[in-house]
């Protein structure tokens, strides 16, 4: 199963980009033996529309256009469900074992996700009730993806 992060906005060179790259490279190395591949990031341009609803609609169309057919679509959203790291790993396992061709993790723009994207999601996921900058959320997501591969592999990285 291909693992993909689809994000509105681009990470500039710096500590956050390096951290995301490091976690995804680690996930890629460990994921091969688990039947997981890719661990790629697609960065979509932020909309320049004036109204928030127009920005969400434009960004939503770009997100939907980037989704692989048949993917398990999991979006980060503050109103989403909180999962333990073990439950997150189990979600990845279930998608893989269920024959899903891809797991697509979505991070929307500053205004959030359009209703069209929300309707396409199989799961809305939250990393708690706090608000985080998008670049930090991307690093947190990359770490959880890596942690999921270590949990599935029985690696000692995860010691909960």
Swiss-Prot record:
Keywords: Cytoplasm, Methyltransferase, rRNA processing, S-adenosyl-L-methionine, Transferase. S-adenosyl-L-methionine binds at residues 76, 108. GO terms for cellular component: cytoplasm. It is an enzyme of class 2 (transferase). SUPFAM superfamilies: alpha/beta knot. Transmembrane segments: none annotated. It catalyses: pseudouridine(1915) in 23S rRNA + S-adenosyl-L-methionine = N(3)-methylpseudouridine(1915) in 23S rRNA + S-adenosyl-L-homocysteine + H(+). Its EC number is 2.1.1.177. Homodimer. NCBIfam families: PRK00103.2-3. Belongs to the RNA methyltransferase RlmH family. This is Ribosomal RNA large subunit methyltransferase H. The gene is rlmH.
